[in-house]
């Protein structure tokens, strides 16, 4: 992971589904200013992501926001339709905004890409959590392995 505390986030293009259509925006336009959490994971519908990571954030979203976090974002390298559908299945509406990095622009800019070709998954994102305030990294946690979900 190249990203460090006090770094500005790379302002890459990210996708989200808006009114049923993919919308491309700069990350700064999506997360804005204020204090937010952005967590990244290898892929929608994958085992650890679906059984632990996303459900953990859904279950604890109110507690996280009670600590001064204004918004929570989930980012993966899947397309925006998949991220939206996965979010709907996991009841993220009003709790977590689902973001898509299909070209790995953000993922590569922060050094979070991992090769999962041997498992038929291609290049994916490592599992991480970033606390951001006014587009600056305040805290960051990165898992050593994508199957782990203890720090993030």
Please name every model-derived segment.
Residues 1-152:
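Chalcogenol-based redox active-site neighborhoods
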């Amino acid at each position: 992971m190249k990203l460090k505390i006090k770094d500005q986030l790379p302002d890459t293009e990210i996708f989200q589904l808006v009114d049923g259509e993919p919308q491309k925006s700069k990350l700064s336009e999506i997360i804005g200013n204020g204090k937010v959490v952005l967590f990244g994971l290898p892929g929608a519908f994958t085992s650890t992501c679906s059984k632990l990571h996303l459900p953990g954030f859904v279950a604890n979203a109110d507690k996280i926001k009670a600590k001064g976090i204004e918004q929570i974002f989930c980012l993966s390298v899947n397309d925006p339709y998949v991220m939206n559908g996965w979010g709907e299945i996991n009841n993220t509406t009003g709790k977590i905004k689902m973001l898509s990095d299909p070209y790995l622009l953000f993922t590569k800019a922060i050094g979070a890409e991992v090769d999962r070709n041997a498992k038929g998954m291609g290049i994916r994102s490592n599992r991480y959590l970033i606390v951001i305030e006014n587009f600056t990294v305040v805290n960051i946690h990165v898992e050593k392995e994508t199957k782990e979900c203890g720090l993030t």
